[in-house]
Amino acid sequence: MREVRAAAFVFFWALFASAAAPIASAPQAVPEGPRPSGAGNLYVVRYDRWTAQDERGFGEFITAIGESQCHTVNDCLHGGDNPFRASDPPGVHFESDCADLPYVLRAYYAWKRGLPFSYEHDVEPRGHTRDIRYTKNGNEVTARTDVLSFSPSGYTLLDAVRDAISSASYRIHPDLQEPLEPDLYSPAIEAKSIHPGTIIYDPNGHVATIYRVDPDGRISYIDAHPDNSVTRGFYDERFVRSRPGMGAGFKNWRPIGLVGATRRADGVYVGGHVELAPNDRIADYSDEQFFGTGKRPRDDGDWARGGFSLNGEAMDYYDFVRAKLAGDKLEFDPVKEVRDMVDSNCNDLHYRADAVALAIATGIQNQPEPERLPPNIYGTEGDWEIYSTPSRDARLKTAFKELRDKAERFVRMYEAGDPKLVYAGHDLVSDLIGTYDREAADCRVTYVRTNGSHVTLGYEEARLRLFDMSFDPYHCVERRWAAADPSELSTCRDGPTKQAWYAAERNLRNQIDRTYDAEMDFTLAELGTPGPGKGVAVPPDVDARRYLMSVRGLRPKNQRHVPLATARP
């Protein structure tokens, strides 16, 4: 591997000004099937750039993993849907958390295909910060590593990437290209630009990779967690927008090329260095996701004033994204939406069950409760990062809230006769209740109590317990699942101190906003007093069914029972 420091970096325009086509779309033939990776496990570069076909192949690789339903990074790369699995010995173990996963998958694919690869291995904060992962003004790239032929083994590369990358690596202003270019750029919100392989960065410290975009514009993603589990979900308001310096949102891999290398007779490129395309040489670079579709404000501080519109109609950002990815058309099939959201929430409950079971298996619940919470319960290190679930739980609660809010939105659209609603029935509310009940009835999640007995919760029971489920890894499994009935809770071995912590953490459980900038290293006594960073007293409404029951019988205004839109065949 070749290290590049900021002071030594020089961009060679010849790569992009040469007679060859731009590296983002060079019409280079690619052989069928996996490319050879060279002798042994060494990284061997056989192609000097990524072509459009390579990018499509990478997207197909990501889609296959996303659709495979693998549950750990190791399972994904050893699984039958990885076309390169036969080249990896059975004893090789793959790991990744959320920030590492996009890089691990990209580096792995580049290695197996013989493609050039380079990565930012050092970022520094722009201004003072307590934690570089949550800097107010973002970070800048100060050092890069080029991966050249025969420099590392592919497995060594994956380890090096995991050591170098954190969520801080994504927290970069879309305009910033100094001291060094970042690996990623901000793409236009277009169907051709947001695709499998595109990364989504949540500035609250989470990263996901898109594996599918449906015809109606709905985005499906995969993500990983500190326990190396892999989960799936739909893009929604859990991925928040924020000031441009934080670099939130969609990111694509910057076009790269190998320059100055010697091509041997066997086709292997030796030496050289990797160069990255600057923003102004990337056809679909755009900052609209930060500033809106109108004129960019002079000051980044005014970013939130930027609005989004399509075909003359003002839109919410998330609607805008969906409409653009659906061919500039925004439509909702409310029955399908509710069905999919209940199903997704059920999957998230199962993912949580796996995470809690993994924590319990380590015995951490038998350790004494520390005297203080971590400096921040959402962004920390060590056992708390691996085995606690405050971030996961907050995202789960947000998803339940979004289902409730979407249900109300669909009802209001139905009542108003909104043509964006694709519904061919005669009683939307009843159909939504029926769909909700059917999907909820099929959802069961089971946990193992301290004495080895099993408790199974239905979807509605889990929803009722949602804000009582402990995120604290030092609590018994019964409290992790909000057991309240004396018979269910009887096997919990938590003493008075842990019981007091559970009670004191209630307001933190009520909070769905992940406040990574808050100081939260409270003692038990401090947590019990009012003050910032201690949560909220009342949780949000997440009961979609109760809302739907409250509006039963509602009909569209000025209509009898005419469908609001023609259903698709």
Kindly give the residue locations of the regions a language model identified.
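Positively charged n-region of N-terminal signal peptides that target proteins for export
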Residues: 1-5
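Mixed-charge, low-complexity intrinsically disordered regions
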Residues: 22-167, 174-177, 266-569
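A recognition module on extended beta-rich or small alphabeta surfaces enriched in W/G with H and D/E
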Residues: 148-182, 226-273
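Short, well-ordered loop/turn sites that connect or cap secondary structure elements
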Residues: 188-196, 200
